């Protein structure tokens, strides 16, 4: 029996012919600084090959219907099991997916209501629970003797027979927002007053309206009520119109679509996101009035267990639901109690595991699309364990993202369960507690990008603590820590001296009324377990309230008061990807390419050829590669196999045509500079003051390893945040509040140190910095901490403690404080 996965000559992304043996049936951690090549080894090599080879064993007909990974750039991967990946950014589910469907707990809950619920007979009488539903025989009403069948579990699903007929199981209604149909009533219909007729319908609809008796040459506000009624609600009647053409005119019989019908017609025909986006601006979304957002039909909602229906049970938090279902066997008649106990026992283990993973505050009706990446990944993790597979390689990409330190033990327990079932686990992570719990460590580095891609340590975890080559070992051993500049942290918030932002709110969601001060000119961390109210406090209350106050607009409804205290600008820096396609690169986003294009247009060769700066754009310029249109890659549609994106064979990924390589500045062409890293390009742009300053800033942000031509959507969350900060680094920040949402996501402790230096630079320039954070190293370095909790959901929503990190550590009520001691 092989004991290791044998990898030889791995060259995925920046890996440099890596040879490594990955132990099977063990907890293997993969570490390294951001951009070192960790994910390239774990996901790009091990998972890609494990999943691809498994899929290749399936029939061709089956493979056509499954998205497949391309073959990894590697010489040999031997003894790799079938692989499953739990990615850092799971796909966003559709509108019909909920926390209940994703965890499959809703399946059990539907079965419980189907089998032991109390039904209404067709005449409206309540019928007590009976085994008849399970036996598939009719129920008989004790009052009117009417016989009828109960509902099966599938018939209670909002994705099938149990759906509300009004909203079709979505829980919401999209209705036309009449106020958006005519945004400017000073315009005439001929001038485009009726907006959807211009963007969603043929423009000749105004001609049809004229034939319907509506004046189209007067301002809309001056139309009579009858004319406006025709515009908004007129009947779908045919009218004879004459349409101007190049040869004179054409006569047509055309059916009238009023403004509301135009939007409804476009919505019904929308088949993709692009089409839906065109319609969205004319719609408002509201809770379905028929089912009150439960998604369920009337008969499903009429089935009760001790006065609670399926919709109400789905709105309970996981903690509340766990307590309620345990009581159900004692609440129902003895006839069905054993059946209830079996169903409840099936629910108990998955619920306990989800609570262990810190998801106790979520309810089953919570839309999956509203869950964070970390929450969705933990749902995946819980499902993986419940499947009880064996012989599978699980590749976990940073499973502790967005996880409070108190829930890390839950993740580790699940990884151990996977191993106990006979599986192997490869975990990419930066959390030193996770790494220290592993059996084996593979560390990639030593640096990022071109400076990484090599194995700098491999072996048992205890050997890494003192290995000279390891960069993570000293952090795991506790001999090295992330530190802020001497004398800056833990000095407290000088609220009296510098002033403070002040916010007062009423209750919203599970967050109680709050009154909070955030010191100016300081680094403040907002902490707390998942669901404790951090996001609600900062992103749903403070940020929109400040922006409204600065714009002179009304405050959000739940905000009682906000004192901006001299803040004149709010800058939210989050980890969302930059751009949506490969045309956005580091050079374009940072502004470096703009100056490079102007510089190359000034060269003698360019002037002789009559080339302007626009010609050097790989998106629209004449010098872009004609084969790939400036994307650097082409997509091959191979039948029976997945689409393959390959490097453009003509430009070799440079995005430029051959002529661009002939135009040189200081001996270098623009394609050659675009292929350089930020650090390398700093030398190549000598004499270009603005470009040089931008590159210096990027290097100071720890992004020196990125290539100028690297597509921004491929950057990690941490890289995206720092790139967004680049434009802010060189100027005064007086009166600016920077808000960061978990800026340490995906960061190695060395990268956290770089980030902390950046935050300190902003503060020294006059800024106030507020971070939502779980990382203990950054929290220890804050001036002020606001700890939310103590739990998640209904058990949270309060400020448990405020003060310096030392104050929080000494507070017995603070869950975060326990991990700061």
Spans of model-derived segments:
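Conserved phosphate-binding elements of NTP-dependent enzyme cores
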Residues: 1-821
